[in-house]
């Protein structure tokens, strides 16, 4: 059995968990998230904990149990606390601003870039060079942050571009004559 799957997922007070076949739904103050659990994993609900047991005779059931436990744990954290991603814009003239649920980016191209945030993700720009994204869905917020970063990834010589706030950009030395 996977080491990750051995640990149960604790359900805090105020969180409602429903298991309908292989569909698991977690409801909390930040919203509701649902996920289809792999058939190789059996989910058991106790009073305030979820346990994940791999089914016998199914290939990679141990790995699937660990994966399911990690994903459900992220769902529980998401509906209780939520997740945030911070992006920084580094470069002369690089700007960001929110227009409703659209992030308007000026990244040195001849045209402005407008990225519409999907349902479940909110954003704010405390300054022109900073974007803060918030969501209950860890995978969705990570994908949205990666999509915004992909418009202008940090380049290795000056470090200009869109980067995560905790990202360390390794810079190269310029070519010498």
UniProtKB/Swiss-Prot annotation:
Transmembrane segments: none
Gene Ontology terms for molecular function: rRNA binding; structural constituent of ribosome
Family annotation (InterPro entries): Ribosomal_uL6-like (IPR000702), Ribosomal_uL6-like_a/b-dom_sf (IPR036789), Ribosomal_uL6_a/b-dom (IPR020040), Ribosomal_uL6_bac-type (IPR019906), Ribosomal_uL6_CS (IPR002358)
A Pfam family that the UniProt record links to this protein: Ribosomal_L6
Taxonomic superkingdom: Bacteria
Gene Ontology biological-process entries: cytoplasmic translation
PROSITE patterns linked: RIBOSOMAL_L6_1
Endpoints of the signal sequence: none
GO cellular component, one term: cytosolic large ribosomal subunit
Keywords assigned by UniProt, alphabetized: Ribonucleoprotein, Ribosomal protein, RNA-binding, rRNA-binding
Similarity remark: Belongs to the universal ribosomal protein uL6 family.
Assembly and binders: Part of the 50S ribosomal subunit.
Entry-linked NCBIfam families: L6_bact
Role, per record: This protein binds to the 23S rRNA, and is important in its secondary structure. It is located near the subunit interface in the base of the L7/L12 stalk, and near the tRNA binding site of the peptidyltransferase center.
Protein name: Large ribosomal subunit protein uL6
Organism (species): Haemophilus ducreyi (strain 35000HP / ATCC 700724)
